[in-house]
Amino acid sequence: MPANSRSARLTHLDDAGLPTMVDVSDKAVTARSATAESRVRFPAAVAAQLRANGLRSAKGGIVETAVIAGTMAVKRTHELIPFCHPLPIDACRFEIDWAGEQLLNIRCTVRCVHRTGVEMEALTGASVAALTVYDMCKALSHSMSIGPTKLVSKRGGKRDIGAAQ
């Protein structure tokens, strides 16, 4: 078992091995935050064209559309991931910028005050924003790639992960 594991048991399986939603009713209500990021890699010619056009495509503003789609996804994560709790999202922020010549970095930070964390919401927001960038640019090339998508940090639960955002 890895050193950072709390137990070998998966929390979304009950004692009989059946899928279940975690009961968070006994957890303390605390401020929760999480940041996730995803990346979109473009072919060199496509990246150059996007830079020249100010990250606009024939479909419109790429960053603006990705932020809207990512925010919508954050708010609907519980409808996409079966055992996620519906959460009252207090804040959702995106940072989208170039990380090198061909790599667009998408960072999503989510905050709420609740009994459970917002990691899945941040991961979903970053993922859907990246998928939206792909959709907005696919007329230029299908040779783009997405990833890695990862949790960068989380705060407010039993343990904190990563640097504070």
From Swiss-Prot:
Signal peptide range in chain numbering: none
Binding-site list for substrate: F83, C84, H85, M120, E121
Gene Ontology biological process terms, A to Z: Mo-molybdopterin cofactor biosynthetic process
GO molecular function, one term: cyclic pyranopterin monophosphate synthase activity
Subunit: Homohexamer; trimer of dimers.
Identification of the protein by name: Cyclic pyranopterin monophosphate synthase
NCBIfam families on file: moaC, PRK09364.1
Enzyme class: lyase
Chain's role: Catalyzes the conversion of (8S)-3',8-cyclo-7,8-dihydroguanosine 5'-triphosphate to cyclic pyranopterin monophosphate (cPMP).
Catalysed reactions listed for this entry: (8S)-3',8-cyclo-7,8-dihydroguanosine 5'-triphosphate = cyclic pyranopterin phosphate + diphosphate
Transmembrane stretches, start-end: none
EC number per UniProt: 4.6.1.17
